[in-house]
Amino acid sequence: MKKLLIRLIKFYRKYISPGRSSCCRFVPTCSQYAIDAINKYGAFKGSALAVYRILRCNPFCKGGYDPVR
């Protein structure tokens, strides 16, 4: 499951993301954060952390450096 999620994120980064403007307010980017979280915490908790991060990535959030802890 973990490998499948990471492959889906990499597919998104390679084929879908280049067509969009760069809009992530965080370092590392939300997709890299998702990969790091899934690798560190597994598919379930890592995905939950990634979804929470993506929800915070909006114009009303300051952003900045936010690594997986």
Curated annotation (Swiss-Prot):
Keywords linked to the UniProt accession: Cell membrane, Membrane
Membrane topology category: Peripheral membrane protein
Localization (cell): Cell membrane
One Pfam short name: YidD
Origin superkingdom: Bacteria
Main localization, broad class: membrane
InterPro entries: Membr_insert_effic_factor_YidD (IPR002696)
Function: Could be involved in insertion of integral membrane proteins into the membrane.
Protein name: Putative membrane protein insertion efficiency factor
Organism expressing this protein natively: Clostridium beijerinckii (strain ATCC 51743 / NCIMB 8052)
Lineage: Bacteria, Bacillati, Bacillota, Clostridia, Eubacteriales
